[in-house]
Amino acid sequence: MNRRDFIKNTAIASAASVAGLSVPSSMLGAQEEDWKWDKAVCRFCGTGCGIMIARKDGKIVATKGDPAAPVNRGLNCIKGYFNAKIMYGEDRLVMPLLRMNEKGEFDKKGKFQQVSWQRAFDEMEKQFKKAYNELGVTGIGIFGSGQYTIQEGYAALKLAKAGFRTNNIDPNARHCMASAVVGFMQTFGVDEPSGCYDDIELTDTIITWGANMAEMHPILWSRVSDRKLSNLDKVKVVNLSTFSNRTSNIADIEIIFKPNTDLAIWNYIAREIVYNHPEAMDMKFIKDHCVFATGYADIGYGMRNNPNHPKFKESEKDTVEKENVITLDDEEATSLSYLGVKAGDKFEMKHQGVADKNWEISFEEFKKGLAPYTLEYTAKVAKGDDNESLEDFKKKLQELANLYIEKNRKVVSFWTMGFNQHTRGSWVNEQAYMVHFLLGKQAKPGSGAFSLTGQPSACGTAREVGTFSHRLPADMVVANPKHREISEKIWKVPAKTINPKPGSPYLNIMRDLEDGKIKFAWVQVNNPWQNTANANHWIAAAREMDNFIVVSDCYPGISAKVADLILPSAMIYEKWGAYGNAERRTQHWKQQVLPVGAAMSDTWQILEFAKRFKLKEVWKEQKVDNKLTLPSVLEEAKAMGYSEDDTLFDVLFANKEAKSFNPNDAIAKGFDNTDVKGDERKIQGSDGKEFAGYGFFVQKYLWEEYRKFGLGHGHDLADFDTYHKVRGLRWPVVNGKETQWRFNTKFDYYAKKAAPNSDFAFYGDFNKMLTNGDLIAPKDEKEHSIKNKAKIFFRPFMKAPERPSKEYPFWLATGRVLEHWHSGTMTMRVPELYRAVPEALCYMSEKDGEKLGLNQGDLVWVESRRGKVKARVDMRGRNKPPVGLVYVPWFDENVYINKVTLDATCPLSKQTDFKKCAVKIYKA
C-alpha cells in the first residue's frame, strides 16, 4: 500500500469509527463508494476546519478532514471527528415543549409537554406581545450566537432591528470576542485581523498570550508545531499563561504570570523598546502610519454600580463596592502614578460612562506612561509561580522582550480568552498592537498581533453581520445616522425605522430580566444560563412569574431546563448555512439530511415568528425612554407600497426581491432544502397546515442581500454560488481575489486605493477624529483627522476587582478542554468524548492539595461570595496551576462553575472576565 492509499484508508476508518461502524480494511473502498460525500465546515471552534461529510439513508454516517481545505489540510481534532455523532444523541429534542398544567394551559410552574408548532408559536406570540405592549421595544431580548449560521444571524438581526425596532439582541460572542472587537475598532478603525493563518508558516516566532492553542485551536497548533519542529533552532515558541498547560509542551519559554499582570508585561516590553532599544523602533512606520493615544483609567469594572441592589447577597457587596471606588496598593499606585496618586488613596471611578473615549498624545507623554514598568517592578508584580525564583522570571521577561525586539525576527502574537475575558480586555488587546506597531511588525507576512476567535462564526455572524446590541452589518452601528440610513435603504424600510439607541449587551439582558425591564427573552444557538457568570441570579430571574423564556435548541441544556417554551432546532448539516472563521475566511455548506423529528432551522423559526406581526403593531410610535420616542413610520410605509396589515414576514423576508430567487436553483440540485420546499416529513407548520416551503431560495436571498452592506468599502464578500465551488475565501474579496494581509498595499486592494503611494493604509474610519491631550485628559475639543492611521495606545496596569483574601485564598479561572465544546450540550452526548472526559475537574497544585489535606480525586467544594459547586480534584492532570490558583472548565452542567464566577466585565467591551475571581476550597 502506498502512502496516499494509507492516508486515504486511515481517514475512512477514522470517519467510520465516529459513526459507530466497524469497517474491515478489505471493504474500505466499497464502503466509501456507498456513501455520498460533500464538503462542509466543522461545527466547533473558530479555526474553521473544512470537513467532508458522508450521508447514507438519510443520516450523516461519517465525517473526515477535507484534504483540499487550506485551513486544516485533511486533519481534524478529536471533536472534529465526531461531527456526525453530535447529531444523534438519545435525548435530541424533536418536538416543541411547553410548560403546561393539567388543563393544557400554559403554566409557569407546570411540566413540559409536547405541543405542535402552531401551539408553540401561539403562546410565544401571546407572551411576546404582552411584554412588548407593556414595556415597549426595550421589554424583549434575544440571546444570539457566534454559532448562528450567517443567514440565521442576519435574519435575526433584521427581524429585531428593522421589524421589532429593538436593539436588545446580543450574541454569546459578547462573552468571547467583544474585547477583541473593541481593540480592533479603537486601534484600526475597523474590525477583524490584518493577518491570516499563513503567518504561521512564515514567522520565526509564535508567542501565545492567554491562548492554550494546543487544546482550544488544536489544528492551528498542529501547524505551529510543524513550523517549530521543522526549524528547531530558528523558530521560537513562548507560552504566557496563568497556569501551565499543553501549549507549553513545545515552548522554548513558559511564563507563568499573576492574573491581570499581562498589562504590566506588555508595558515592560514597550518600555524596553522605547527606553533601552530605540534603534529597534520603526520610526518611519510610526510617523507615516500611527499616532499615540490614551484614555481614562477610572472606568470601573462593568459590575452593577449599586452595591445595595436588593438582589445581592450580603457576601457579594464588598466586591461590588469596587465598581465605584478602590483603595490603591503600592503596585497599582505605581502604575497609575502619572495621575498623581499614591498608595492608600481612594481611587474613584469617575469616567464609567465614557470608558471608550480616547485622544491623541505625544510620544513624550506615551514614554512617560511607560516609565514605571522597569524589569524590577514588572517581575515583582507579575511573577505567578511561587516555585520560580525572581531572577529566573526576570530572565524570561528579558528573553521575551528580546524576541520581539530582534530586528529581522518575524513575530506573531496569538491570544484568545485569556486576553478577552478580562476586566481590561480591550486595553490588553490594544497593548498587543502597541508593541507590534512600535517595531513595525504588523500587517506583514509572518508578523502581526492576531486575535484568535473562539466560535465557528463569531467573526462571520456576530461581528460581520452585526448581531450585537449596538451594531449593524459591515462594522456599522445603530448610533450613526448615516449607517441607519444605509441599512434602511438596503432593507427597504422607511427612514427612522431603526432605533438609534444601543440595546442591552448580553449580561445586561440577564440583569434586565432580573430587574423586570425585560420580560420576554428568546435564546438561539447558545446556552446563556450555563455560560453567564453569577448564574444563581439569572436562574432566579428566569423563574420570575412575569418572565417568559423561549429556548431554541437541539438538546435540553440548562437554559432549556429553566425555559418556559423549548423549540427543537435543526443542527448544522440539517440546513444550509455559512460560517466565517478567525482569518476572515467565509465557508458555505449545503443541507445534507433532513432534520430529526419535527426540528426546524432557526431561520425558519425566525421567519415563521415574523408572520405573527403586522406593521401597525411594530412600526407605530414607540417610547424607548424618557429622552427618546421612535416615530410612527406607517405613513412612510404606505408611500412605499406597504399596507399596515402587511406582516413583517411579507416586508422583510418574502418581498418581491426575495421571491425572485429560484427555488430550483442549479446549485441546490440533488440536495434537500427544507426551508424552501418542505420535505417528506410533512411538518405541520406554525399555522397548523403542512409546511411546503417558502417557494423561493431564502438562504441565497439572505446572503445576497447581506453582502450588499460590505461591497465597496473593505468588507466585500463573494456571491453565493462562488462559495459552493471553493474551500472558503478571505474577505475582502475583490474581483474574485481574496485578501491575505489587510492594510498592506502589496496585498490589500483597499489599502492601495486609500494610499497608492504608501506601503500601508489603516483605512478603517471608526473614531478617526481625535482631540489632543496628555496622559490625564484631553486638553481641547478641537478634533483633527487621523485618516489612514492606526493608534498606539498607552494603557496602565490595573488589578482585578476581586482578588484572593484570607477568607477566599484562591484565584479561580474557567475555560474549555480539548474534548468538549462550550457547555457540553452536544459533546457530552458523544459516548467517546464523554468517556474521555466525563466530568469537569478542579485542577490545582499538589502543594495546595497537601496543605488542604486532599488526595487525588477527592471531591471538594469550590465556593465564592456568590455560590458554590462540588468538583473532583486533579493535581496530576494536563493543567498545572501554580500555588494559589485553581482551574475548573465550564462544559459540565453538573459542575455548574458559573454559579461561582463574578459578573465583572471590561467596561469598554462589556465582556465578562471569567478568568479571575476569589474562591475557597474545602473537602466535600
Curated annotation (Swiss-Prot):
GO terms for biological process: Mo-molybdopterin cofactor biosynthetic process; nitrate assimilation. Binds 1 [4Fe-4S] cluster. Binds 1 molybdenum-bis(molybdopterin guanine dinucleotide) (Mo-bis-MGD) cofactor per subunit. The gene is napA. Predicted to be exported by the Tat system. The position of the signal peptide cleavage has not been experimentally proven. Component of the periplasmic nitrate reductase NapAB complex composed of NapA and NapB. Residues 1-30 form the signal peptide. Its EC number is 1.9.6.1. This is Periplasmic nitrate reductase. It comes from Campylobacter jejuni subsp. jejuni serotype O:6 (strain 81116 / NCTC 11828). It comes from the Bacteria. It holds the Pfam family Molybdop_Fe4S4. Belongs to the prokaryotic molybdopterin-containing oxidoreductase family. NasA/NapA/NarB subfamily. It is found in: Periplasm. Substrate binds at residue 890. Its cofactor is [4Fe-4S] cluster; Mo-bis(molybdopterin guanine dinucleotide). Keywords: 4Fe-4S, Electron transport, Iron, Iron-sulfur, Metal-binding, Molybdenum, Nitrate assimilation, Oxidoreductase, Periplasm, Signal, Transport. Its main location: periplasm. Residues 35-91 form the 4Fe-4S Mo/W bis-MGD-type domain. It catalyses: 2 Fe(II)-[cytochrome] + nitrate + 2 H(+) = 2 Fe(III)-[cytochrome] + nitrite + H2O.
